[in-house]
Amino acid sequence: MTVQTTKTDLNKTLRVKKDYLEKNRKRYKVDATGKTLWRLAASIAIKLTGKDKAWYNDFWDAGDYVIVENADKIATTGKKMTQKIYYRYSGYKGNLKSMTLAEKLQKNPTDVLWYAIRGMLPKNKLRDPRMKRVKLIVGTTTKYDNFKPISL
C-alpha cells in the first residue's frame, strides 16, 4: 500500500480498512534452535502487534501470523534454567505449585515460549486474538508450507 501525503495532511491519522488488514497478513516462520528465549519472544510480539508496519495503531489488530519450529530447543542465558521459577496457585490454602524452567521445558516445551510471548503483548482485548496467530511446534513440520511463510 502506498500512501501519498502532502505537507498539509502530515498530522492526519492514516486510516486503513479492516478488510485490507486481514487480507494482507503475512506469515513468518522462525526456527527457535539455539535462540535466546526472551529475545525471540520480543521479536515475535512485535510481529504479532504489527509494530513493524507503517500503519500501526495500538487499537488496531494489524499483526501477522508467526510459526515457530523447534520450540523445545530454545536457549537461555545465565542460570535461568534452574533459577527461573513458574508459579501456579489454584486459590486453595497450601496449593501453591512451583516449577523451574528446566522442568517446564521437559513437561510441555511450548508453554515456556507461549507464556513469554503472552507476557510481552499489551494486556487488553486484543491479546487473545493475537495469541491465536502464534503456532508453536515441537520439531519441524511442512504443514504450513502452503502459506509460503517468510523466514525470520
Regions flagged by a language model, labelled:
Residues 2-115, 125, 147-152:
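Ribosome large-subunit tunnel/peptidyl-transferase-proximal elements
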Residues 113-114, 118, 131:
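Hydrophobic, well-ordered secondary-structure segments
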Residues 127, 131-152:
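Charged phosphate-binding loop/patch that engages nucleotide di/tri-phosphates or the phosphate backbone
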